[in-house]
Amino acid sequence: MNTNEQRIPASALPISPQWVDHLQQNFITYFRLFAGLPGITFAEEAVIWSAGQGDIILSTQLADSDLDQQIDKTLHRIGQHTDAVDWMVFPACRPVDLGEHLRKRGEVGGPAGEWMLHGQIGGPGGNWMWLDLTTLGAPPATPDGFHVKQVINQAMFDEWTVINATGFGADDYSAFHAAYSRHGFGPDAQAIHFIGYVGTAAVTSATLLVAGGSASVYNVSTPTALRRQGLGGAITHAALQVARARGYRDTWIWASDLGKSVYAKLGFVLTDFGIREYQWKKRSA
């Protein structure tokens, strides 16, 4: 990830602090879908975190008093499940100078000197992008016969699981299959899945998560041999059309380095939402 790329500040766009809070709640909901599954711990307390799926801290609401001890306690608890964690600091996290405290705890190694910060300390935490859905243009060109279907039953989701896992090169997709199967595919589902086909062959897949006052596309996946045909962009476009039809005027995505250019072609722009990342790992890891 090129952290020096220019990002448009959220203040320069029609984005309010509440909008960013909705983004955070949507992000939390994504990880909450996996709560309770084997090998996954999701803690929803003053600090909300996930281990086994993401290894990430999603929200922090701590008091100023004894803050260093609370940071150490959090790392100690998470360290029982993983050797590394991304502590994401959103604008709504407290205290307001949490990032500075995390940096200082990193200098002394966290609890018992067992942890260290690495990477870009206090960096943007990935490729956060924003799109004005009212300006969404035409989908990219795709092979003849390409079309998208929404997953409406278990059989279709089983097919989604195979093509999505293939695109990510994943050997074990049991957590995704279990989480989304448990969530269901009815009209009230927050997670809406899509499969792209050429003829009858599944070639790409994605998920739209509508939750927390926000809508975002996740899990965009195309097998390596089928890439560079506009498939990932086209299925993302189909999901965005559903978000727009549900009344959302804008959206965001947390893009991989590989996917960033795909989303830029749809109109997404790199944006600084005020989110900062502190990457921790155990010194023995």
Regions found by a protein language model. Give the residues of each.
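A conserved beta-turn-beta hairpin within the catalytic core of GNAT-like acetyltransferases
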Residues: 48-58, 210-217, 227
